[in-house]
Each structure stands twice: as C-alpha cells, then as structure tokens.
Amino acid sequence: MMAHRTYILVIALLTVLSTHAQLGRYNADIRALPQDFCDTITIEWERDQIYVPVSTGGRSYRFLFDTGASQAVVFSGSPLANAPRVSSLLSHDAAGNTDTVSVVGLPPLLLGHTTLHNCHATVQPRGVGARNIDGILGFDLVNSGLSLKLDIQSKRLIISDRECCFDREEAATSLRYRLFYHVPYVDIIPFGRRRERVLFDTGSRNFFSMTLDHFNVAEEKRHRFYRPYRVEGRTIGQHAIGHGGTEPMGEVVFLRLDSLGLGKCSFSQVHAITTQGGSHLGARLLRYGTVAFCPVHSRLFFQPYEGLTTCVNNRQLDIAFISDMMGRPQVGLVWPEGTPYRQGFRQGDIIEQIDGRPVLSLIQFVTWPFERGREYSFTVRSTDGRRHEIKWIRVPQ
C-alpha cells in the first residue's frame, strides 16, 4: 500500500467535569497567603494544555490547570493521595461515568510566591491523558474568591486576592459566567442566531465541541436556503475518555462553522465535532487572547491578541483512539472524509503492531517514539478478525 500522511489524535479528556451529587460539602474556602497579593507564575503551554509548577513538602509537582474540574485532583499511588481523607463525593467524568471518590485535604501548596491552604482534592485513577502530570488544579481557586488571568503569549498565570483585580484592564469582551456544579459556563453563538451555553474547559484541547442533541435541534430548525455551517460528515464512534472509562458508542457529526461568536469577538472557519457530553469551549481559545476571571461579579474577560475577528481554520479531527476491554489501542472514531479512512482505518480496528513490534496498551501507543517524517507500518486487526497492514507518515497534530 502506498504511504500516506495522516493525523492521529488521542482524545483523553481527563477533566472531572463536575460534581453532580455530593456526599460531602463542596469546598470553596481555599485561603491564600500572604494577603492583599498579586502574583505572577510562569506556566508551560504544551499541546493546548496549561501546566503550573506546585510544590509541597519539599517536592515539586507538575499540575494541569483545568477550569472544567470543580476542584483539585490527585492520582492513586501518588504521595499526595495519602493526605488525610475528609469526605467522599459522587463524581461525573467527561464520558458521563459516575463513581464515588475519596476527597483528601492537601497540605499547604506553594504556587509561585503564594501559599494555598485548605485545598481539597478528589483521588482518581491515573488515566492515559494524565501520564505526564502529578495532579490537577481546578476552578475552586476562583470559586474561593481569587481573581485569575491566563496569558499564553507571555506564558504566565496572574493570581490575586484583590477584588476584581482585572476589572479595569482593557478587554474586548466581558461575559457573565454561571456556575453549574461549580464550573463556569458562558453563552456563545456557534452559528446563525443559535445561542449555546458552554463549559469553558481548559482541560479540553479542542476549540469547540457541541452536544449532539443540541445540534440536531438546530439542524431541524435551519433555513432551507441558508446554513451558517457545513456538515463535513457523520459516523458512529466514541472518542471521549474519562476517569471511569470511555463514552458509549453514538453518532458523531463533523462540522465547519462559518463564524462562532464570543461576545464582541468572532472566530471564522472553526472545525468542530459533536459530543454525547456537554458543549464546551476548550483551551485552544487561549491561542487567540487572554482570559481573566473576576469571581466577585462572575465575569469572564477575553482580550484578543489581534483583532475582534480571527480565522481559526483548525484541522478537522480525522481519527481518535480509545482503549478496548483489554487495554489495547483501538480506533474509536474515524472521519469518513479523512486520510486515515482512505488508508483503510475503520472504527473498531485494534492496533496490534508497529513495524513488527507488539503494542500492548493505549499508554504504550500514545508514548511511542515516533520520528517526524518517518514511515511506519501498522498491523491492524479489524472487527471481523482480519489483519492487514497500513503504512503512513505521522504528521504531528
């Protein structure tokens, strides 16, 4: 088979999206010292994710900053998971799975020059997407009254206990956010006059994903001669991976939006997919401007780096991998119009070997030392048990 180029993306939404029903009281009483402060922390921005340095007990840790997490998360087996247990709660993950999880009281955390006291964290199993982090910082930082600003261009996080610290800064858009299960939702215009309430979720690498049911309602009401989006394909698959497992199989619609509105700002040529979970605006928004939170007035401020109108023109997701029942990498979703589909990849295919070397787990697959520009041979077993070879040259996402 001729060598082709393709894009591979593993969707591993490690966000604990919300705390739907709680057995213990939600903690929004993080105390920051010293008082009356404004601190700047240098952050890492890697593959559309925000990583912050945290230290405690003489050790340094790497935490993901995730506004889609209602509070901090630490992983089973980590020293931090041995902190005193304070309660339990019922947690819902990104794939819609529910589980009762333990909540521990973390020791004081040093973030920049600021010490955070009374942080609570849920204890979760370490998923595929969490292999390179020690924990998650959630939106309880803001819910506890701390103002916060993210500036990816300058690679900095600014945090302050001063009331509405960023209110007087110039911002093109000021939106009221509403808390549902302790995480922030804002209203956007994905197309036409459609108003959609979305989770602003920095734990997601996507720019935008829309609830399938909401899209189907909008599709039924569309004007027969005007549609401010293009359906680029439909298929059956699954792509979201949460702490409790993978989302159920379902229909996925591939979209290209003419213009997505965020307050006074608009984003054109946005590729997106539907999801069985809630609609969300992901961390990729931060490529295009700063985001600040003022908890006193529940405001989100967005200031674009350039003009009010931005052409996103992001790549369409053409293939996503999940884990099968035995932990092996499996094609969860493949775009019918994409290169991987033309190569022969199909939903349900299991990756057994790469260049003759066995692939035993999804974690092994996503950490494979691929070299840019090199052709690889995949041994794939389809759902009917047949094996075949697919050659491709990996193009980084």
Could you say what each language-model-derived stretch is?
Residues 21-397:
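Pepsin/retropepsin-fold aspartyl endopeptidases
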Residues 1-25:
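Bacterial Sec-dependent N-terminal signal peptides
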